[in-house]
Amino acid sequence: MSRIGKMPIKVPPGIKVDINGNDVTVKGPKGTLSRSFRPEVTINREGDYLVVAPVGTDKATRSFFGLSRTLLDNMIVGVKDGFDKNLEIVGVGMRADKDGDKVVFKVGFSHSVTVAPPAGITLSVDGTTKVKVSGINKEDVGQMAAEIRSIRKPDHYMGKGIRYAGEYVRIKPGKAIGKGAK
């Protein structure tokens, strides 16, 4: 059995979980999330805990067992605390500006790039070089952060571009000068 899958999930006070077959709805102070889970797993409530159990022992069932437990745990954490991902802009003249709910990136192109967040995601700009992506759905927050990073990935010669906060970018050495024929 999956080590992650067999751990029960504690439901904190103030969080309401509705289980209807394989459809689960989680309501909390930050919002509501719903998800349909695979038929290979069953989700049951036992007191203040949620327990995910596999239906069979084949490989497909085992592969969805731990995944389902983690997705359910992320739903509970999301409606209780939310998720956020921080991005940094590195480079001379590169910046981000807030324009209503949109963010305008000026990252070395001849044009500016405007990013509008989808429903449930908020973008905030701290200064001109830090962007924060927040929301209750961990998958959507990560996807939005990845899309913003893909606007201008950090280059490996100067390190300029948009990167995750704390991300290490390996800088390659430039061309060697003075080596070769005389």
From Swiss-Prot:
Keywords: Ribonucleoprotein, Ribosomal protein, RNA-binding, rRNA-binding. GO terms for cellular component: cytosolic large ribosomal subunit. The keyword RNA-binding applies. It comes from the Bacteria. This protein binds to the 23S rRNA, and is important in its secondary structure. It is located near the subunit interface in the base of the L7/L12 stalk, and near the tRNA binding site of the peptidyltransferase center. Part of the 50S ribosomal subunit. Belongs to the universal ribosomal protein uL6 family. This is Large ribosomal subunit protein uL6. The gene is rplF.
